[in-house]
A protein has these predicted regions:
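Ankyrin-repeat boundary/"N-cap" motif
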Residues: 2-16, 34-45, 64-88, 110-130
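Repeat-mediated protein-protein interaction surfaces in helical alpha-solenoids
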Residues: 17-30, 112
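Ankyrin-repeat intra-repeat helix-capping/turn positions
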Residues: 20, 47, 82, 93, ...
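Hydrophobic repeat-domain scaffold segments
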Residues: 42, 46-55
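Short, intrinsically disordered, charge-balanced linker/junction segments flanking boundaries
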Residues: 125-128, 135-145
């Protein structure tokens, strides 16, 4: 990961997904350009299909690898990405990255449990349909799941 520590990656995942502050994620990318290509998780969050495919070519099991802070896999992180929701110009990259992950064995029904008073299961489908309101990615997950 070069100058990208596991803690920095976890902070980026927190900022770039779900309800995270995207400005913070952008600041981290500016300060640490290697973060964008540090892992399959960061590539997925950014909709970098070529990057996702490179990680899968090196290690196909990366499709199901989990990462802090939530314990999500790359597909779940992709579907909860703030970039997916806020930048529709990245749609082709996100759909291609999701397809590559699914082809490599990612679980279209996968997710993670939140912690707190009322734990909930956050899934890829919830991210695509309920958070990003992304019909193409939602359809892909339903077809595969």
């Amino acid at each position: 990961m070069g100058d990208v520590t596991p803690e920095l990656q976890a902070s980026f995942i927190r900022a770039a997904t779900w309800h995270g502050p995207l400005e913070e994620a952008e600041s981290m990318l500016g300060a640490h350009p290697g973060l964008a290509v540090a892992s399959i998780h960061t590539a997925a969050i950014l909709g970098d299909a070529d990057g996702v495919r490179r990680f899968l070519a090196e290690d196909p099991s990366a499709a199901t690898a989990t990462a802090p802070p939530y314990g999500g896999d790359p597909l779940v992180h992709l579907c909860l990405s703030r970039y997916l929701r806020l930048d529709r110009s990245r749609t082709p990259g996100f759909v291609a990255a999701a397809t590559a992950l699914l082809d490599a064995g990612a679980d279209p029904n996968g997710g993670f449990w939140t912690t707190g008073t009322y734990p909930e299961r956050e899934t890829a489908l919830y991210g695509a349909a309920g958070v990003a309101h992304h019909p193409e990615l939602t359809r892909l997950l339903l077809e595969r799941g």
